[in-house]
Amino acid sequence: MEATAAPFSSIVSSRQNFSSSSSIRASSPASLFLSQKSIGNVNRKFKSPRSLSVRASSTSDSVVTLLDYGAGNVRSIRNALRHLGFSIKDVQTPGDILNADRLIFPGVGAFAPAMDVLNRTGMAEALCKYIENDRPFLGICLGLQLLFDSSEENGPVKGLGVIPGIVGRFDASAGIRVPHIGWNALQVGKDSEILDDVGNRHVYFVHSYRAIPSDENKDWISSTCNYGESFISSIRRGNVHAVQFHPEKSGEVGLSVLRRFLHPKLPATQKPMEGKASKLAKRVIACLDVRTNDKGDLVVTKGDQYDVREQSNENEVRNLGKPVDLAGQYYKDGADEISFLNITGFRDFPLGDLPMIQVLRQTSKNVFVPLTVGGGIRDFTDASGRYYSSLEVAAEYFRSGADKISIGSDAVSAAEEFIKSGVKTGKSSLEQISRVYGNQAVVVSIDPRRVYVNHPDDVPYKVIRVTNPGPNGEEYAWYQCTVSGGREGRPIGAFELAKAVEELGAGEILLNCIDCDGQGKGFDIDLVKLISDSVGIPVIASSGAGTPDHFSEVFEKTNASAALAAGIFHRKEVPIQSVKEHLQEERIEVRI
């Protein structure tokens, strides 16, 4: 059984700290922020291990100690560990770290608040001593970055100083999109141990900052990854491991990484898992539109130009299945990510009882790829009069299993205000969530409709020449953003919105098109090309997929990083695997 004691995250109340109005820099001790000159003088106490043997467990071989400092989605690693047959002991005191037989540190969120928590609670010193003694350790994502001297994120900010180097932001001038989101390949070195089964398979990354190989840290490196440049994707020295990617979100190959850490004496397989990964893959995302039907049941539905009701006398909500079951099937079918869109208000529920929260908790038990949830990420007051901020709503979604949250109407309001004033207030849900959890955790969903015009000067928005003329032969159009499920048009174009939300902290754009929704005639290539050419963050093409050819078309003709579909997968018209096989035949990199 899992230990019943409260996790460290609840003791330090870091979630409440993150919700405060003070900025990260203000909430962090001044000692965390270093000058570039002093960064190189960080004291490093790590000693080379005398033995590579695994320390025998003094309690139980089926218990893992987990350091959860209270930010982001840690439920997924918990579920992965349970899936592998392990129970979890949560860190409550520094002594729990020192007494751990094996320790996993799934760092999520931003560097500065994580170091703030570790320093305030004495965990930083305990972590360094644990690692110095060559005890079994696995850091994940931020759990790798914190081992370095410092980070430029919100800083410079001093790290644990175990590994030489500065964690810096990816260089977008190299022609890459930042954040680095998606499935990429590893270049595995010798003696990686926990990566022995990976081979040429993709693993899942989501980060904006990285550490670079150097002469000073080369002895730590067990694998690198290429994204505009070579960066450190994993380290290993003795029993100390850390990875930049998310094994708990990398499907079966990721579970094999965790399994090898937990069972270091497992015999090597005859050959690594088969695959042909060589670079960042294009993603195929399955979307589930979730709402209550007229009977009060939570169902997956699908719209026709955003209309989700059957065209019959009953006019009932289309019911295409139960969300948890469908998500599980999509995972088995090979979906690279699963996106839930909550299209019901649910405002009568207390936050912890929201139906979508329950869907996430159940889904994340057996689905080990990224989960995104959208709809309703805004301030609200429930039926009892309790007020919740958008940051609290997002925090609950993350703690329930979401890896990314998608903001729609609220982002439109924030963008309109930003364009009008030219000032970032820091008060919008987009800015607040991005500041606490990093922009890689925030997706902005854009719902535009095509508006034809006779001449580019007819409107004060970005106008393009379209491939298909309008009903009166118009050769030009702009894309008007909408809110309230497409029912209300706003005085802002998709181009203007995309540029604004990137400035405000969005890490990814989900680009829909009302005109193409449910039509099965392909994505709006003109729109996708316009937006993906205009921003430096990843763009997900959505609306209109009807055949595998539509996926290859959008990847070949635009700079979209991913393509999303709903209805064709729900109705089993096109299997996910068929889409991937087609993309592979077209020589488009995909995860198989």
UniProtKB/Swiss-Prot annotation:
- EC assignment: the record states 4.3.2.10, 3.5.1.2
Q: Where is this region: Cyclase?
A: 280-592
One annotated GO biological process: L-histidine biosynthetic process
Q: Where in the cell is it found?
A: Plastid, Chloroplast
- TM regions (residue ranges): none
Looking up SUPFAM superfamilies in the UniProt record yields: Class I glutamine amidotransferase-like (SSF52317), Ribulose-phoshate binding barrel (SSF51366)
Domain Glutamine amidotransferase type-1 stretches: 63-271
GO MF annotation, one: glutaminase activity
Q: Which reaction does it catalyse?
A: 5-[(5-phospho-1-deoxy-D-ribulos-1-ylimino)methylamino]-1-(5-phospho-beta-D-ribosyl)imidazole-4-carboxamide + L-glutamine = D-erythro-1-(imidazol-4-yl)glycerol 3-phosphate + 5-amino-1-(5-phospho-beta-D-ribosyl)imidazole-4-carboxamide + L-glutamate + H(+); L-glutamine + H2O = L-glutamate + NH4(+)
Q: Which residues form the active site?
A: C141 (for gatase activity), H246 (for gatase activity), E248 (for gatase activity), D289, D447
Q: Which GO terms describe its cellular component?
A: chloroplast; chloroplast stroma; plastid
Q: Which UniProt keywords apply?
A: Amino-acid biosynthesis, Chloroplast, Glutamine amidotransferase, Histidine biosynthesis, Hydrolase, Lyase, Multifunctional enzyme, Plastid, Transit peptide
Q: Where is the transit peptide?
A: 1-55
One protein family per Pfam: GATase
Pathways per UniProt:
Amino-acid biosynthesis; L-histidine biosynthesis; L-histidine from 5-phospho-alpha-D-ribose 1-diphosphate: step 5/9
Q: Which family does it belong to?
A: In the C-terminal section; belongs to the HisA/HisF family.
NCBIfam families referenced in this protein's UniProt entry, alphabetically = hisF (TIGR00735), IMP_synth_hisH (TIGR01855)
Q: Which HAMAP family did the record assign?
A: HisH
Q: What does this protein do?
A: IGPS catalyzes the conversion of PRFAR and glutamine to IGP, AICAR and glutamate. The glutaminase domain produces the ammonia necessary for the cyclase domain to produce IGP and AICAR from PRFAR. The ammonia is channeled to the active site of the cyclase domain.
Name recorded for this polypeptide: Imidazole glycerol phosphate synthase hisHF, chloroplastic
Which species is this UniProt entry from?
A: Arabidopsis thaliana
